[in-house]
Amino acid sequence: MTAFQKGFRGLLGRLLGGSRGWSTARPRPGRQPDARKTAVLFLSHVVNDDVIAEYRKISEAVKDFARPHFLLHVRPDTPFDARLAGEVYPFTDKILRAMRYGPWVDSFVPGSAHFPLLHFFADQNHYEQYWLIEFDVRFSGDWRRFFESFRTVEADFLTSCIRRHADEPDWCWWPSLSHPKKFIPETKRLGSFNPIYRISNAALKHLSESHRDGWVGHFEVLIPTLLEQQGFKLADFGGQGSLVAPDRKNKFYTEGTDGTMRPCPCHAEAGPQADKLYHPIKRL
């Protein structure tokens, strides 16, 4: 076993054992922020050839304007892979209770998949924008072209399938949004689908403060609703919803059970439609 492997396993033990490690680290005094103003976070609990290859593809696409990070959900069976040395930002289930507020339910799924981003933001809050991309998202085109398409889009929250209550009144997660003393009528709530999204520094700060204030809920209703209520600007990658810009209708994804972006069923691979986001890809 090499010295680096020993170091990684030691880190893994500290993470799982509760000692202070990378997942709870804060910026060191005097550390200079990255000159790039955007962070691109690739979120995964899986480490294999396909996942690493996709992370590399995205990293190459954003290298001129963003700093990539591999957000790894570390568990006892997480494999060591030296190819990710120095690029992993690890976290464990313990972050769900480590930020002075708790999740809607005591697990990342369902509905708390934004907690790794909130944890990262608490550590590295100097970026202006944050992209979050789940490991099973693919783009059937040039990732660089995709990111460049939104460089000038001034939105605090850029995601997919944004809809109002009237668009899908029977959606099961509307009632999950709650607060001990405050109430937002379901008719004024928004939903979104967030396997990939971009969010501003100010919006993340507001979400953190909202959680500390007592708001909880599935993040697909919590994020868009609380941001719109506070006057933040929302935008959609494509699709057919009322918040989609006319020139982006169905441009980067299609909706529905037969669409390119959906909760299920799984796609075996990205395609055959060109320049579209696909989720979920489960040939892993």
Describe these PLM feature segments.
Residues S210-L284:
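C-terminal catalytic/acceptor-binding lobe
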Residues V47-V62:
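Short, well-formed alpha-helical segments that are part of the catalytic scaffolds
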Residues F139-T225:
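Conserved catalytic core of nucleotide-sugar-dependent glycosyltransferases
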Residues Y127-D136:
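Short beta-strand-to-loop acidic/aromatic patch adjacent to the donor-nucleotide binding site
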Residues N48-I52, P76-D81, E168:
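Short, charged/polar "capping" segments at the starts of alpha-helices
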Residues T38-V47:
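A conserved hydrophobic helix/loop-capping motif in glycosyltransferases and polysaccharide synthases
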Residues V74-H126:
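Active-site-proximal specificity loops/subdomain of glycosyltransferases
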Residues M1-D34, L284:
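Membrane-proximal basic amphipathic "stem/tether" segments
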